């Protein structure tokens, strides 16, 4: 993952979609303005009540036919490998019945690493994985979607699992 992932999707697609981003980005001068112009949905990640209200708003957007782009890693760092996927996107897919289309974005971390602002040459690519759809509205189904997405991304990216560090 990289700062470039969203820009790559914007520049390489004619589809109309909205990003889902952490609420803190709305307060950032450049990123907030850019994301608001793209019609982003900002979500609360800390306060459960705010997060629940945001989830309902996202379900309404999905029911209205809006395409949402969610980066399920939630964040990124300089370390290689795929981070654990957060459950939000998969719970939304299970609750709404919306189709999930995993996208594997490669090369952006090498091109612009976390904490660096000078790009390095790298091949960029976006791989579309097979679409997934929930078969029922349940937590176990959301877990199945998460695990299937993770397996598809790891296969396309040819990256290792990233083992989280504790302490």
Protein language model features and the residues they cover:
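Non-catalytic C-terminal accessory region of glycerolipid acyltransferases
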Residues: 52-167
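Catalytic core of membrane glycerolipid acyltransferases/transacylases, capturing the structured
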Residues: 1-48
């Amino acid at each position: 993952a990289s700062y470039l992932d969203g820009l790559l999707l914007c520049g390489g697609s004619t589809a109309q979609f909205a990003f889902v981003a952490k609420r803190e980005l709305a307060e950032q001068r450049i990123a907030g303005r850019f994301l608001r112009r793209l019609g982003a949905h900002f979500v609360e990640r800390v306060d459960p009540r705010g997060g629940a209200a945001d989830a309902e708003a996202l379900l309404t957007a999905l029911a209205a036919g809006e395409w949402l782009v969610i980066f399920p890693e939630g964040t990124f760092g300089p370390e290689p490998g795929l981070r654990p996927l957060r459950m939000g996107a998969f719970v939304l897919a299970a609750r709404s019945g919306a189709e999930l289309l995993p996208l594997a974005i490669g090369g952006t971390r090498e091109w612009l690493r976390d904490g660096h602002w000078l790009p390095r040459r790298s091949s960029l690519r976006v791989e579309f994985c097979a679409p997934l759809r929930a078969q029922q509205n349940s937590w176990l189904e959301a877990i199945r979607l998460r695990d299937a997405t993770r397996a598809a991304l790891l296969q396309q990216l040819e990256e290792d699992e990233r083992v989280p560090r504790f302490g």
